[in-house]
Amino acid sequence: MQRGEPIRMADAHHAAPPAFLNVDPRVPPGVRELLVEADGCLKAGFLTGGTVCAQKAVQTLLTHEAAEGASFEARLHALSQKYPSVPQSLFALCIRLGDSPSREHPALDGDRLKVLTVALKIMLYEIYVLGPDRVERLKYLQQLLESCESGAHSKSPTVVAFPNA
């Protein structure tokens, strides 16, 4: 497989897993445990159990983040508003695949379950790893900027590297 070439589901099993596929300890324990269980069910071929665990992980995340709304979709929309830097496509996938199973479709097939768990892992990585890391980087930059400006009597206006701190 060449760089820039799309990953096929069969290839995804042989490549070294990206960092975001390992659920970080900063992710709320209830969500993390459900995702581990969903992965275990998927590997064992228990698609109904995996589907229930993955969908419960989404619900647990919504509860943990106090995402309110009249429907599952509205709650995910509220979460997307809380974290605007998280790609909207991840929320769309959770809306499409993460709602509770119905009698007609009790379980996702293996590929769709994998897509849901990976989308959720990426979302969690964005929220609980990249977001806090971004805040730390910007705070550090702000401190550097403030030390530069306090040492020099610049005539230029003060620049704020991190306006929402």
Identify the function of each model-found stretch.
Residues 31, 50, 54, 58, ...:
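Short runs of predominantly hydrophobic/aromatic residues within well-ordered alpha helices
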Residues 42, 61, 102-105:
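Structural motif corresponding to the C-terminal cap of alpha-helices
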